[in-house]
């Protein structure tokens, strides 16, 4: 593997962990070092850090808060 690719991977803890969990990427980057952008995208999908994943997490958080508010209101009206 090229030195700059190794430095790129070792610069970030998540990249290092991802390449350990998905060793196929070590082989792919050794053969095609230009594939760093797809490596980064695949890592973000794996750890659910893409924009659609974050929007979904945010939406789930809001739905949970709304459900809690409805529960509190229902409990308050019973009293």
From Swiss-Prot:
Pfam families: YlbE (PF14003). InterPro entries: YlbE (IPR025613). This is Uncharacterized protein YlbE.
